[in-house]
């Protein structure tokens, strides 16, 4: 199992949808989770052949320090790796930083966030997913 670490300063080429410049100080305005209905006709006993769920992060990146073009991030077939810390149920969330890694054809996104209404104020969420779409 090889694991590649992709960050803004990494010499490796990140995926085309990744926000290479960073989203520091972007505001997460909405977090939506959606479970797709199971399609028995398309099921081939292989897990990666269909979309099971989607996590959509709607952002206001106008105040971000670097990349202000990102409007929404969709993570397909996601799973929280930090089940005690998720993105749902928080007040105002601010993006501090992130790290994207690739392992066995899946992505892992570790997001560092700030929630001024929670204790502790800073939190880290790790999410594994199979593919992503970024709306700019």
List each language-model region with its residue ranges.
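Surface-exposed, interaction-prone regions used to assemble/regulate multi-protein complexes
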Residues: 1-136
């Amino acid at each position: 199992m090889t694991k590649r670490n992709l960050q803004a300063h990494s010499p490796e080429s990140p995926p085309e949808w990744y926000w290479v410049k960073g989203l520091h100080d972007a505001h997460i305005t909405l977090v939506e989770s959606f479970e797709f209905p199971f399609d028995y006709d398309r099921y081939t006993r292989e897990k990666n052949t269909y979309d099971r769920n989607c996590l959509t992060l709607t952002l206001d990146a106008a105040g971000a320090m670097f990349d202000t073009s990102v409007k929404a991030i969709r993570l397909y077939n996601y799973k929280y790796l930090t089940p005690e810390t998720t993105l749902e149920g928080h007040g105002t969330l601010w993006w501090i930083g992130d790290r994207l890694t690739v392992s066995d054809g899946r992505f892992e996104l570790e997001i560092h966030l700030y929630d001024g209404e929670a204790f502790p104020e800073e939190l880290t969420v790790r999410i594994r997913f199979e593919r992503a779409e970024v709306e700019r």
